[in-house]
Amino acid sequence: HLTLQKGKTWCELSAKNNYFFFLLEGALIVDFNECVGYEVGKGEMIYLPRSADFKIFAKESADLIILSYGIPVQLCDKLSLSQLGAFITDFKYEFKSLDIRVPLDTFLKLLVKYLDSGMSCQHMHELKQKELFLILRAYYTKEEKVNFFYHSIAASLTFKDKVMGVYLEARTVQELADKCGYGLKTFQRLFYSCFSE
């Protein structure tokens, strides 16, 4: 839970995580990759994938919740991001926010209460991540989710294509990582993220 004062710029994200920004009050101007000057208002959310090139500017004082994750907690096949990959073909991506709708607004109000009272442990964060993905699955359309998570879905598909194209030529994990153009640790992290679903 964070307050960003009017006129302040924020860009302190880790390249290892994906981020949800939920704007409870105020207005932000977001520069994200090719999209410059996108305005996010009260009651909207945006998603920034790991290693995103971005800048966030507070047009008005902003009250926001920032949730981050490295690899999404696995729920079930119907909730995995990779399942949305089937809908990405011939899809026209446009960076845009999503409205925070019922029951996501209630989820966020309760989350603020938890955080403001100092309740912040790994178990609570994992539970809330699961709950968030359940809400997104049930209350947002496939088209909205594909557009919202487009960069993560596309990156996952690209990695998967690389692996599937060369895996028969590799005898070890290190060889497979080399053939795909990654260091071993990065390859293992991406592999787990892509294929653990």
Residue ranges and their predicted role:
Residues A138, A170, Q174-E197:
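Basic/polar phosphate-binding segments, predominantly the helix-turn-helix DNA-binding elements
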Residues R101-K113, E126-Q129, K145-R171, E175-C180:
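A short, Lys/Arg-enriched amphipathic alpha-helix from helix-turn-helix/homeodomain DNA-binding modules
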Residues C11, D90-D99, N147, E175:
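A ubiquitous short alpha-helical element
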Residues H1-T89:
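N-terminal regulatory/effector-sensing and dimerization cores
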Residues L28, L136-T141:
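Short alpha-helix boundary/capping elements
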Residues Y140-N147, F195:
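Short, Lys/Arg-enriched N-terminal segment that forms or immediately precedes the first helix
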Residues S80-I135, D161:
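Amphipathic alpha-helical segments enriched in hydrophobic/aromatic residues interleaved with Lys/Arg
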